[in-house]
Amino acid sequence: MKHIVKHIHFVGIGGAGMSGIAEVLVNLGYEVSGSDLSRNAVTDRLQALGARIAIGHDAVNIEGANAVVVSTAVRSDNPEVLAARAKRVPIVQRAVMLAELMRLKQGIAIAGTHGKTTTTSLVASVLAAGGLDPTFVIGGRLISAGANARLGTGDFIVAEADESDASFLNLYPVIEVITNIDADHMDTYGHDFARLKQAFIEFTQRLPFYGSAVVCVDDPNVRQIIPFISKPVVRYGLSPDAQVRAEDIDARDGRMHFTVIRDGRAPLAVVLNMPGLHNVQNALAAIAIATDLGVSDDAIQLALAEFNGVGRRFQRYGEVPAADGGQYTLIDDYGHHPVEMAATIAAARGAFPGRRLVLAFQPHRYTRTRDCFDDFVNVLSTVDALVLTEVYAAGEAAISTANGDALSRALRTVGKVDPVFVATVDDVPDALAKVAQNGDVVITMGAGSIGGVPAKVAQHTQQKA
């Protein structure tokens, strides 16, 4: 590719999916430019690495580019897309560019409705501990690396495979992971769950004859597609028929202690430096891959015990002063689907038994809120106190029956929690100052702009002091 394409431009370079690919390309020696609507830590990092960053979208930004990379979130009338089309500069989907990177190495693609980012991070960390020095492209910041991407010298590239727009069907990895299959992004599949499951089957058909599908048999929908997978399958999970399974699971001090049982191998005692049964499952996927690739048990144990997590995945911000005196524990999480939220809430209950749980939640997308409305009501009703914001639209038109006010009314009707509704995330710090008490566990949660709230909460409490 490099002898033809030397300058690659990214429209929306600050996004989680785009920035990782851009960083790897910079490190491969390509000239990289990109644009986004605002600066953030990601664009600053890319600029420091040598990428040319423009704030705002303008036709002039693509000057000299041999290819323009877009995600499905980029509109067709974007001025840079229009300019590329007028100049006959190839417009490349993000997943297609990721597929090109996978052609340079042996790809390990992590798919599933939930858990992709954490599982990808765990796989990359365990392989790195085993001396395989993988390249990785992750949808969140791997805290130990301080970045969401890295160019390694080893043979493998570990990356997330995105089913939300069916773009994972562009990838041809040698190892695939399927964590779970759930009803999300159903617009892509015509609101037909059978089509979604069929897409995952087609994903496994991208494997070569020597490849393998590493699948979580705890998920009933994953279990249903196994008979239709024509390539070798490695089953992991908590189920008795899992080839890589966890037993004797014990949650202590925010960590998960368990024993790994693998066919033909001695039991392996593991301490995972993360809470939650769902993270035990994610770790089992990494253990299955690492075992297959010859990583030593000592390296597996070390990597999982020292895993520092991923940005916005149960990320701890420490203790924050409470208005009534004392302090509360502040955690931030990316969860935005009811299944993910339930797993995070369960992890928090397990990590902090007996403590009051306060959730500040920003729903993400009106269509998701509409499609999962009852499930949102059910999961939000399980917390002890709730601050709820208006829906983060993500470019969608508002739906009056699926907005924050409608969700608040439904929650009050159920009567298990009385939400404090705020119009914007800017109001969350004030709301939390009134709600959070000494000894509470406070979680800010959502895939939108609420990710900036924890830093503001800390600043807010300092100003009040």
UniProtKB/Swiss-Prot annotation:
EC number: 6.3.2.8
Reactions performed catalytically: UDP-N-acetyl-alpha-D-muramate + L-alanine + ATP = UDP-N-acetyl-alpha-D-muramoyl-L-alanine + ADP + phosphate + H(+)
GO biological process entries: cell division; cell wall organization; peptidoglycan biosynthetic process; regulation of cell shape
Name of one Pfam family that matches: Mur_ligase_C
Any one of the GO CC terms: cytoplasm
Pathway(s) per entry: Cell wall biogenesis; peptidoglycan biosynthesis
Protein keywords: ATP-binding, Cell cycle, Cell division, Cell shape, Cell wall biogenesis/degradation, Cytoplasm, Ligase, Nucleotide-binding, Peptidoglycan synthesis
Binding site for ATP: 112-118
Domain of life: Bacteria
Class of the enzyme per the UniProt entry, highest EC level: ligase
A GO term, aspect molecular function: UDP-N-acetylmuramate-L-alanine ligase activity
Subcellular localization: Cytoplasm
Reported function: Cell wall formation.
Family, as annotated: Belongs to the MurCDEF family.
PANTHER family per UniProt: UDP-N-ACETYLMURAMATE--L-ALANINE LIGASE (PTHR43445:SF3), UDP-N-ACETYLMURAMATE--L-ALANINE LIGASE-RELATED (PTHR43445)
UniProt xrefs under HAMAP family: MurC
Protein name: UDP-N-acetylmuramate--L-alanine ligase
Organism: Burkholderia lata (strain ATCC 17760 / DSM 23089 / LMG 22485 / NCIMB 9086 / R18194 / 383)
Gene name per UniProt: murC
